[in-house]
Every structure is written in structure tokens, then in C-alpha cells.
Amino acid sequence: MSDTKQATGAEQAERAGEAFLEAERKTIDRLLPGLDERLAGHPLEELESRESPAIEYFRESGASNILIPSEYDGVGATAVEALRVQRAIGSRAPSLAIAATMHSFSLAGLLALAAETEEKDSVEWMLLQGLAQNKLLVASGFAEGKSGQGLFAPTMRARRDGENWLLSGSKKPCSLAYSMDLMATSCAMEGDGGEFEGYAIAVVSSQLPGIEVEPFWSAPVLTGAQSECVTLRDVEIHDELMIRMGEDDGTGLDDLQTIGVVWFELLMTASYLGMASALVERVLKEGKSDANSKVQVAYEIEASMAALESVGHEIDGGRNVVELALRSVLVRYAAQDAIARAAASSVEQLGGMAFIGSRDVGYLAAATRALAFHPPPRLRSGDALLEALHGAELAVA
């Protein structure tokens, strides 16, 4: 039996249990033994603090390798399994879920490049195997935090310096700012004479001179994601660690970028479904409302998770990920609305004393709202989505 068939059988067995979050908790326990238990052993307030142990728990469990194939020493999870793990993490530690998504998003492009090579010992596969063996964390230096800018629009500039490059620029906010081992960032390349040479993804070691981390995140939620300002000043990058992307600045989508967008939308949405699930779980156990009201918030979340999993099953079945870009964005927006409804109703059903007596309820409700801030912004995406629904190529702004 192949690894894919074995994983599919395990997925079906786990989903056979109907208890809320049962499949997600079984999946994370099977793939990453001990991680969920360690997270559950801490109060939410501690896990969400700047001093949170959650990221190190994530690293130690091998969760950073979840998308890397097992033949390269990774976990080798299917897409559906990865989504369930992400929801489980979000239900325990929202900040960790955000940081984990940005790590996996950073790997998505590298995995796509590696999949295109027939050489099992290519630079891309060797790098991925090194990441897995050493449990390294990769921060994202892409333009995810900038309003109105493409997800892959270059945030930095690389200037030719002999055989290597000098990389300068900043990313804010940048999750995993203090815990990252590497950063993957988009950049515009300039030749010796300042001439434009195209765009690239640079792979940067956090130990190189010229990298500075400064406080940036001031919001009272999701502080445990370490989303601070990372500045690079003439950081020397070897040429082999500059992955060329041609002359597309990231406002359009080529296949590599599209794959990144799909994974970003799926994993980020699963993260916020996890946060909302933490509220719903409290309602099911402690809510003062009637049975119908409790069931309503549960089906809002379960229907959204089923939609996410349907895209995951397509990926696991061999569907070209590029063809799933529109669906992934539409599923994300539908889930975003369902999360807002479920969170608001959950707070009401838990009642004023639960809100007053613990910071957790208000915190989780506030955290779930942040999904609206991730790209692509819905208020500016209507025209592009409508055109895509009529058959045009999806453009993410």
C-alpha cells in the first residue's frame, strides 16, 4: 500500500469520529505525538505571550517538516492532514498557528520547484532535506503585510557584488522574527551597473551579519507569533541561494506563486477556524443557551472545514494546485464570514460572566477577526474574482 493510500485510510478513520475537533486532535497526535498535549498544558494567555514556549514546542515536535515528503526526512503529511493539524494548533495556540502558516507558506514555493526537478539530489531537495533533518524554521519575507501589494511583490533589493548579491530591505510584520533559522524573501535584482535583472526568491540565513530585529507588533492579540520588523542591510547572499522568478513582480501570478497562494489561503483559513473552534468548544461544554443555538455555531465551523478539506482532497488526488487558486480564495471568504458569525454567537452564548471572568473569550473573539486582514483583501478583489469566475486568470492584489 502506498503512503498516500495509507494516509487516506487514516484520514477516513479519524473523520469517522463525530465529536467536535476529534479528527483534528487524532491527526495531530498521530503525526506529531505530544505537541497537542504540551500546548494544552499551558493557559491560553501564556501561549499567546511574547515569552510563549509554543514555537519551540512546534520545532521540537518536527511540525516544521509537515509538508516535506518522508523520503526527505519530513513528516510527509497529505494536504488534508496538514489542514487538520493547522486547525488543531489554532484551537490551542492562535499565535503559533499564524507563525506555522507563514513557515509553511515559505516552503510551498521551494517544494513546488523541487517537484519540477527529476533529480532526487537537486539543490532544492537537498535544502528541504536539510530543513527537515535540522528542524529549521523559515520566516516569510514576502509582501503579505502590505495593503494593496501583491502577495509576492518584492520587499527587498539585491545588488550584484562580484559572484554574490547584497540584499537590503525590510519586512514588517515578519512572523518568527526571533526564532527563524532562515528567511525566504522576494527581491528585485540589480546588476553591477544598477540595471534591472529580474526578480528572485532569496534564501537567507538568520545568522548572517547585517540582519536586525526590532519591535513592531503593538496589537494586544497574536503577539506570540513574533511578528516584528526584520531589516536587512547589505546581507551577502550566495548566487545559488537566489531562486529566479523572471520579470514578474508578483502582481500577476505564475504557477510557482499560484501554488503559494493556494497553500497560504488554505492553511491560514484552517488556523482561524481553529481559533473559532476554541470558542465553539467552550459553548458546547459550558454554554447557557439551547441545543439549537449550540449546534448552529458548530455547523458554521464544520461546514467551512469540510469546504477546506474538499480542496485538500483535490490536491491529494493529484489535481494541479494551480487550478485551485480561485476555489481556495472563495472558500476562504466563505469561511471568513462563517467564523465571524460563529465567534459572535459563541461570545453571546457563553454569557457575560464568562467574558468577564476570563480573558480567553474576548481574546479568541478578537483574534478571529484578523483573518480579514490577510491577502487578498476582499474589498479590492471583487472585479478580479468576477473575471476569474468568467474564465480569466486570477490576479491577486
PLM segments and residue spans:
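Glycine-rich, charged/polar anion/phosphate-binding loops
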Residues: 170, 189, 214-219, 262
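Glycine-rich beta->alpha junctions and the first turn(s) of the following alpha-helix
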Residues: 217-302
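Glycine-rich flavin
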Residues: 51-60, 64-170, 175
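Generic structural signal for well-ordered, non-transmembrane alpha-helical segments
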Residues: 33, 274, 295-305, 309, ...
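DPxDG-like acidic metal-binding loop motif
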Residues: 170-208
